[in-house]
A protein has these predicted regions:
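Conserved P-loop NTPase "ATPase switch" module shared by AAA+ and STAND
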Residues: 73-96
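Post-Walker A helix-loop "phosphate-sensing" segment adjacent to the P-loop in P-loop NTPases
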Residues: 48-56, 266
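N-terminal pre-Walker A segment at the start of P-loop NTPase domains
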Residues: 1-25
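A cross-kingdom feature that marks ATP-driven nucleic-acid transaction machinery
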Residues: 2-3, 32-36, 41, 224, ...
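Short glycine-rich substrate-engagement loop in P-loop NTPases that contacts/grips substrate
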Residues: 53-81
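Hydrophobic positions on the alpha1 helix immediately C-terminal to the Walker A/P-loop
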Residues: 42-46
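Interdomain motor-coupling "hinge/lid" segment immediately C-terminal to the ATP-binding subdomain
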Residues: 102-185, 189, 197
Length: 345
Protein backbone atom coordinates (compact mmCIF):
# COMPACT_ATOMS: atom_id res chain seq x y z
CA UNK A 1 0.00 0.00 0.00
CA UNK A 2 3.04 2.30 0.18
CA UNK A 3 2.82 3.04 -3.53
CA UNK A 4 -0.89 3.88 -3.32
CA UNK A 5 -0.23 6.13 -0.35
CA UNK A 6 2.65 7.83 -2.17
CA UNK A 7 0.43 8.77 -5.12
CA UNK A 8 -2.36 9.84 -2.78
CA UNK A 9 -0.06 12.22 -0.92
CA UNK A 10 1.76 13.42 -4.06
CA UNK A 11 -1.21 14.20 -6.24
CA UNK A 12 -1.15 16.61 -9.22
CA UNK A 13 -2.86 19.99 -9.06
CA UNK A 14 -6.48 19.60 -10.09
CA UNK A 15 -6.92 23.01 -11.70
CA UNK A 16 -9.48 24.25 -14.20
CA UNK A 17 -8.01 24.82 -17.65
CA UNK A 18 -9.79 25.42 -20.96
CA UNK A 19 -13.26 23.92 -21.32
CA UNK A 20 -14.09 21.20 -23.85
CA UNK A 21 -17.47 20.72 -25.51
CA UNK A 22 -17.91 17.34 -23.80
CA UNK A 23 -18.45 16.89 -20.07
CA UNK A 24 -17.91 13.97 -17.68
CA UNK A 25 -21.22 12.55 -16.37
CA UNK A 26 -21.75 11.51 -12.76
CA UNK A 27 -21.08 7.80 -13.18
CA UNK A 28 -18.31 5.26 -13.59
CA UNK A 29 -16.82 6.10 -16.96
CA UNK A 30 -13.99 5.23 -19.33
CA UNK A 31 -12.69 8.24 -21.25
CA UNK A 32 -11.22 7.05 -24.54
CA UNK A 33 -9.20 9.04 -27.01
CA UNK A 34 -5.83 9.46 -28.71
CA UNK A 35 -2.68 10.63 -26.98
CA UNK A 36 -2.62 14.40 -26.45
CA UNK A 37 -6.37 14.74 -27.01
CA UNK A 38 -6.90 16.49 -23.66
CA UNK A 39 -8.14 13.60 -21.52
CA UNK A 40 -6.13 14.77 -18.52
CA UNK A 41 -7.38 18.35 -18.88
CA UNK A 42 -10.98 17.15 -19.03
CA UNK A 43 -10.45 15.00 -15.93
CA UNK A 44 -8.67 17.75 -13.97
CA UNK A 45 -11.44 20.22 -14.81
CA UNK A 46 -13.95 17.77 -13.36
CA UNK A 47 -11.89 16.87 -10.27
CA UNK A 48 -11.24 20.54 -9.44
CA UNK A 49 -14.65 20.63 -7.72
CA UNK A 50 -13.38 18.21 -5.05
CA UNK A 51 -10.83 18.72 -2.30
CA UNK A 52 -7.43 17.13 -3.08
CA UNK A 53 -7.68 14.80 -0.08
CA UNK A 54 -10.94 13.43 -1.53
CA UNK A 55 -9.21 12.16 -4.69
CA UNK A 56 -6.93 9.24 -5.46
CA UNK A 57 -5.27 9.81 -8.85
CA UNK A 58 -3.15 6.96 -10.23
CA UNK A 59 -1.13 7.35 -13.43
CA UNK A 60 -0.24 3.85 -14.60
CA UNK A 61 2.42 5.23 -16.97
CA UNK A 62 4.33 6.77 -14.07
CA UNK A 63 7.58 4.78 -13.80
CA UNK A 64 7.21 4.72 -10.02
CA UNK A 65 3.85 2.97 -10.15
CA UNK A 66 3.63 -0.82 -9.82
CA UNK A 67 0.57 -2.55 -11.26
CA UNK A 68 0.62 -5.09 -8.42
CA UNK A 69 -0.42 -2.34 -6.04
CA UNK A 70 -3.87 -2.36 -7.68
CA UNK A 71 -4.52 -5.62 -5.81
CA UNK A 72 -4.59 -3.57 -2.59
CA UNK A 73 -6.76 -0.77 -3.97
CA UNK A 74 -10.02 -1.83 -2.30
CA UNK A 75 -8.39 -2.18 1.13
CA UNK A 76 -6.61 1.15 0.75
CA UNK A 77 -9.86 2.95 -0.02
CA UNK A 78 -11.62 1.30 2.93
CA UNK A 79 -8.90 2.57 5.26
CA UNK A 80 -9.10 6.06 3.74
CA UNK A 81 -12.82 6.77 3.83
CA UNK A 82 -12.20 10.46 3.10
CA UNK A 83 -11.42 9.53 -0.53
CA UNK A 84 -14.58 10.10 -2.55
CA UNK A 85 -13.26 9.77 -6.10
CA UNK A 86 -10.87 7.41 -7.87
CA UNK A 87 -9.16 8.20 -11.18
CA UNK A 88 -6.96 5.65 -12.94
CA UNK A 89 -5.09 7.26 -15.83
CA UNK A 90 -3.45 5.56 -18.85
CA UNK A 91 -5.10 2.15 -18.46
CA UNK A 92 -4.13 -0.46 -21.06
CA UNK A 93 -5.89 -3.57 -19.72
CA UNK A 94 -9.23 -4.49 -18.16
CA UNK A 95 -9.39 -3.97 -14.40
CA UNK A 96 -11.46 -5.74 -11.76
CA UNK A 97 -13.03 -2.86 -9.86
CA UNK A 98 -16.24 -4.50 -8.65
CA UNK A 99 -15.31 -4.05 -4.99
CA UNK A 100 -14.78 -0.29 -5.34
CA UNK A 101 -17.75 1.64 -3.95
CA UNK A 102 -16.83 5.20 -4.95
CA UNK A 103 -17.16 6.83 -8.42
CA UNK A 104 -14.35 5.96 -10.84
CA UNK A 105 -12.89 7.68 -13.90
CA UNK A 106 -10.63 5.65 -16.18
CA UNK A 107 -8.70 7.03 -19.13
CA UNK A 108 -7.23 5.04 -22.01
CA UNK A 109 -6.08 5.40 -25.60
CA UNK A 110 -7.33 1.88 -26.40
CA UNK A 111 -10.52 1.79 -28.46
CA UNK A 112 -11.12 -1.89 -27.61
CA UNK A 113 -10.87 -1.53 -23.81
CA UNK A 114 -14.21 -2.26 -22.14
CA UNK A 115 -15.02 -2.73 -18.45
CA UNK A 116 -18.34 -4.08 -17.25
CA UNK A 117 -20.51 -1.47 -15.55
CA UNK A 118 -18.68 1.50 -17.08
CA UNK A 119 -20.08 3.98 -19.56
CA UNK A 120 -17.75 5.16 -22.32
CA UNK A 121 -16.94 8.65 -23.55
CA UNK A 122 -14.77 9.28 -26.61
CA UNK A 123 -12.73 12.48 -26.54
CA UNK A 124 -11.39 13.51 -29.92
CA UNK A 125 -8.77 16.13 -30.68
CA UNK A 126 -9.88 19.75 -31.01
CA UNK A 127 -12.18 20.52 -33.90
CA UNK A 128 -11.94 23.93 -35.57
CA UNK A 129 -14.63 25.46 -33.34
CA UNK A 130 -12.70 24.51 -30.19
CA UNK A 131 -9.45 25.71 -31.76
CA UNK A 132 -11.00 29.15 -32.36
CA UNK A 133 -12.36 29.24 -28.80
CA UNK A 134 -9.13 28.18 -27.11
CA UNK A 135 -6.69 30.16 -29.28
CA UNK A 136 -8.37 33.43 -28.25
CA UNK A 137 -6.61 35.24 -31.06
CA UNK A 138 -8.37 38.33 -32.37
CA UNK A 139 -7.71 37.47 -36.00
CA UNK A 140 -9.85 37.28 -39.15
CA UNK A 141 -11.42 33.85 -39.61
CA UNK A 142 -9.31 33.14 -42.72
CA UNK A 143 -6.15 33.67 -40.66
CA UNK A 144 -7.44 31.26 -38.01
CA UNK A 145 -8.11 28.63 -40.68
CA UNK A 146 -4.51 29.10 -41.85
CA UNK A 147 -3.17 28.70 -38.30
CA UNK A 148 -5.27 25.57 -37.81
CA UNK A 149 -3.90 24.06 -41.03
CA UNK A 150 -0.35 24.80 -39.89
CA UNK A 151 -0.63 23.53 -36.32
CA UNK A 152 -2.99 20.58 -36.67
CA UNK A 153 -5.28 19.27 -33.95
CA UNK A 154 -2.69 18.10 -31.41
CA UNK A 155 0.91 18.27 -30.26
CA UNK A 156 1.68 15.25 -32.47
CA UNK A 157 0.99 17.37 -35.52
CA UNK A 158 2.95 20.30 -34.14
CA UNK A 159 6.09 18.91 -32.47
CA UNK A 160 8.21 16.50 -34.50
CA UNK A 161 10.17 15.20 -31.51
CA UNK A 162 7.00 13.67 -30.04
CA UNK A 163 6.74 11.28 -32.98
CA UNK A 164 9.96 9.46 -32.07
CA UNK A 165 9.01 9.50 -28.40
CA UNK A 166 5.60 7.91 -28.98
CA UNK A 167 6.06 5.53 -31.93
CA UNK A 168 8.50 2.70 -32.65
CA UNK A 169 10.42 2.35 -35.92
CA UNK A 170 7.83 0.18 -37.68
CA UNK A 171 4.98 2.47 -36.64
CA UNK A 172 6.85 5.53 -37.91
CA UNK A 173 7.65 3.92 -41.27
CA UNK A 174 3.99 2.96 -41.71
CA UNK A 175 2.87 6.47 -40.79
CA UNK A 176 5.37 7.99 -43.24
CA UNK A 177 4.04 5.77 -46.04
CA UNK A 178 0.47 6.74 -45.21
CA UNK A 179 1.45 10.42 -45.17
CA UNK A 180 2.97 10.15 -48.65
CA UNK A 181 -0.11 8.28 -49.89
CA UNK A 182 -2.76 10.26 -48.06
CA UNK A 183 -6.11 10.10 -49.81
CA UNK A 184 -4.97 7.19 -52.01
CA UNK A 185 -6.34 3.65 -51.94
CA UNK A 186 -4.06 1.64 -49.67
CA UNK A 187 -2.89 -1.93 -50.32
CA UNK A 188 -1.36 -3.61 -47.27
CA UNK A 189 0.63 -5.93 -49.57
CA UNK A 190 2.14 -2.97 -51.42
CA UNK A 191 2.85 -1.21 -48.13
CA UNK A 192 4.64 -4.33 -46.84
CA UNK A 193 6.83 -4.57 -49.95
CA UNK A 194 7.84 -0.91 -49.57
CA UNK A 195 8.68 -1.38 -45.89
CA UNK A 196 10.80 -4.47 -46.59
CA UNK A 197 13.19 -2.25 -48.54
CA UNK A 198 13.95 -0.26 -45.39
CA UNK A 199 13.62 -2.59 -42.40
CA UNK A 200 13.23 -6.21 -41.41
CA UNK A 201 9.59 -7.04 -40.74
CA UNK A 202 6.78 -9.46 -41.60
CA UNK A 203 3.41 -9.01 -43.23
CA UNK A 204 1.72 -10.10 -39.98
CA UNK A 205 3.66 -7.45 -38.04
CA UNK A 206 2.65 -4.76 -40.51
CA UNK A 207 -1.01 -5.82 -40.40
CA UNK A 208 -1.01 -5.98 -36.58
CA UNK A 209 0.69 -2.57 -36.30
CA UNK A 210 -1.85 -0.94 -38.61
CA UNK A 211 -4.67 -2.40 -36.52
CA UNK A 212 -3.03 -1.10 -33.35
CA UNK A 213 -2.59 2.39 -34.84
CA UNK A 214 -6.30 2.35 -35.59
CA UNK A 215 -7.10 0.98 -32.12
CA UNK A 216 -5.16 3.84 -30.50
CA UNK A 217 -6.94 6.53 -32.56
CA UNK A 218 -3.92 7.48 -34.69
CA UNK A 219 -5.29 6.49 -38.09
CA UNK A 220 -8.82 6.15 -39.45
CA UNK A 221 -9.70 3.94 -42.45
CA UNK A 222 -12.54 4.81 -44.82
CA UNK A 223 -14.05 2.00 -46.91
CA UNK A 224 -15.22 2.13 -50.51
CA UNK A 225 -19.00 1.81 -50.65
CA UNK A 226 -18.96 -1.16 -53.06
CA UNK A 227 -15.45 -2.58 -53.46
CA UNK A 228 -13.06 -4.07 -50.89
CA UNK A 229 -10.87 -0.99 -51.00
CA UNK A 230 -9.93 1.56 -48.37
CA UNK A 231 -8.20 4.85 -47.82
CA UNK A 232 -6.44 5.63 -44.55
CA UNK A 233 -6.45 9.10 -43.02
CA UNK A 234 -5.02 10.54 -39.79
CA UNK A 235 -7.13 11.35 -36.73
CA UNK A 236 -5.05 14.55 -36.69
CA UNK A 237 -4.58 15.92 -40.20
CA UNK A 238 -1.53 17.83 -38.92
CA UNK A 239 0.44 14.59 -38.67
CA UNK A 240 0.82 14.51 -42.45
CA UNK A 241 3.15 17.51 -42.72
CA UNK A 242 5.11 16.36 -39.67
CA UNK A 243 5.95 13.05 -41.37
CA UNK A 244 7.07 14.18 -44.83
CA UNK A 245 8.20 17.29 -46.73
CA UNK A 246 6.22 16.69 -49.94
CA UNK A 247 3.35 19.13 -50.34
CA UNK A 248 -0.14 17.79 -51.03
CA UNK A 249 -2.66 20.39 -49.93
CA UNK A 250 -5.61 18.77 -51.70
CA UNK A 251 -5.43 15.57 -49.67
CA UNK A 252 -4.48 17.42 -46.49
CA UNK A 253 -7.70 19.40 -46.92
CA UNK A 254 -9.61 16.12 -47.39
CA UNK A 255 -8.20 14.86 -44.09
CA UNK A 256 -9.16 18.12 -42.39
CA UNK A 257 -12.76 17.74 -43.59
CA UNK A 258 -12.95 14.14 -42.36
CA UNK A 259 -11.66 15.21 -38.94
CA UNK A 260 -14.51 17.71 -38.69
CA UNK A 261 -17.01 15.01 -39.69
CA UNK A 262 -15.98 12.86 -36.71
CA UNK A 263 -18.31 14.90 -34.51
CA UNK A 264 -21.29 13.26 -36.25
CA UNK A 265 -20.27 9.83 -34.85
CA UNK A 266 -21.25 8.19 -38.15
CA UNK A 267 -19.52 5.80 -40.53
CA UNK A 268 -18.50 7.41 -43.81
CA UNK A 269 -17.75 5.85 -47.18
CA UNK A 270 -16.16 7.05 -50.40
CA UNK A 271 -16.45 6.44 -54.13
CA UNK A 272 -15.26 8.19 -57.29
CA UNK A 273 -18.11 10.69 -57.05
CA UNK A 274 -17.99 11.68 -53.37
CA UNK A 275 -15.02 12.29 -51.07
CA UNK A 276 -17.12 11.12 -48.11
CA UNK A 277 -20.77 10.29 -47.66
CA UNK A 278 -23.03 8.89 -44.95
CA UNK A 279 -25.53 6.13 -45.66
CA UNK A 280 -27.39 7.20 -42.51
CA UNK A 281 -27.84 10.95 -43.01
CA UNK A 282 -27.77 10.65 -46.83
CA UNK A 283 -25.41 13.63 -47.11
CA UNK A 284 -22.32 13.66 -49.33
CA UNK A 285 -19.23 15.84 -48.94
CA UNK A 286 -16.79 16.79 -51.67
CA UNK A 287 -13.42 18.37 -50.94
CA UNK A 288 -12.99 21.23 -53.42
CA UNK A 289 -10.43 23.53 -51.85
CA UNK A 290 -9.59 25.55 -54.98
CA UNK A 291 -12.43 24.92 -57.47
CA UNK A 292 -14.38 28.01 -58.51
CA UNK A 293 -18.19 28.09 -58.63
CA UNK A 294 -18.46 27.46 -62.38
CA UNK A 295 -16.35 24.29 -62.18
CA UNK A 296 -18.28 23.13 -59.12
CA UNK A 297 -21.57 23.52 -61.01
CA UNK A 298 -20.18 21.46 -63.89
CA UNK A 299 -19.14 18.74 -61.46
CA UNK A 300 -22.55 18.84 -59.78
CA UNK A 301 -24.21 17.96 -63.09
CA UNK A 302 -21.84 15.02 -63.57
CA UNK A 303 -22.62 13.51 -60.15
CA UNK A 304 -26.36 14.24 -60.17
CA UNK A 305 -27.38 10.80 -61.44
CA UNK A 306 -25.27 9.05 -58.77
CA UNK A 307 -26.78 11.27 -56.07
CA UNK A 308 -30.29 10.27 -57.16
CA UNK A 309 -29.28 6.60 -57.39
CA UNK A 310 -27.99 6.59 -53.79
CA UNK A 311 -30.88 8.67 -52.47
CA UNK A 312 -28.57 11.55 -51.58
CA UNK A 313 -30.43 14.85 -51.75
CA UNK A 314 -27.82 17.06 -50.08
CA UNK A 315 -24.30 17.44 -51.48
CA UNK A 316 -21.83 19.80 -49.81
CA UNK A 317 -18.76 21.11 -51.63
CA UNK A 318 -16.23 22.37 -49.06
CA UNK A 319 -13.87 25.08 -50.31
CA UNK A 320 -11.45 27.62 -48.91
CA UNK A 321 -13.51 30.68 -49.77
CA UNK A 322 -16.31 30.05 -52.31
CA UNK A 323 -19.97 30.04 -51.27
CA UNK A 324 -23.16 29.27 -53.17
CA UNK A 325 -26.30 27.13 -53.12
CA UNK A 326 -28.41 25.69 -55.94
CA UNK A 327 -30.78 22.82 -56.74
CA UNK A 328 -30.76 20.23 -59.51
CA UNK A 329 -33.74 17.83 -59.79
CA UNK A 330 -34.49 18.12 -56.08
CA UNK A 331 -30.88 17.69 -54.97
CA UNK A 332 -29.48 20.56 -52.92
CA UNK A 333 -25.91 21.43 -53.83
CA UNK A 334 -24.28 23.63 -51.23
CA UNK A 335 -20.88 25.31 -51.59
CA UNK A 336 -19.37 26.35 -48.27
CA UNK A 337 -16.02 27.77 -47.18
CA UNK A 338 -14.37 25.56 -44.57
CA UNK A 339 -14.99 27.92 -41.64
CA UNK A 340 -18.75 28.10 -42.28
CA UNK A 341 -18.91 24.35 -42.86
CA UNK A 342 -17.16 23.66 -39.55
CA UNK A 343 -18.77 26.34 -37.39
CA UNK A 344 -22.24 25.68 -38.79
CA UNK A 345 -22.71 22.27 -37.13
Amino acid sequence: MKILNFFYENHPKFEISYERKVQIPLCNIIIKGPKFSGKKTLIFNYLSQFKPNEILFLNLHDTRFENQSLEHLSNFLEKNAQIKFLCIYNVEFALNLQDIKIPIIISTDKKDLHIEGFQELELDYFDFEEFVSISRKNLPINNLVGLFLQSGRSKLGEKNILLRQNFNTLELEILKYLALNLGQQISISKLFLELKKRLKTSKDSVYHTIKELENTYIIHPISHDEKKLQKIYFRDFGLRNNLCIQKDFAHLFENLILNELFKFKQEFFYNKFFTFYSKVSKIAYISSSTLDIDLIKLRAKKILSKSLELGIFHVVFITLSSEDSFFEQGVKFEVLPFDKFSLGF
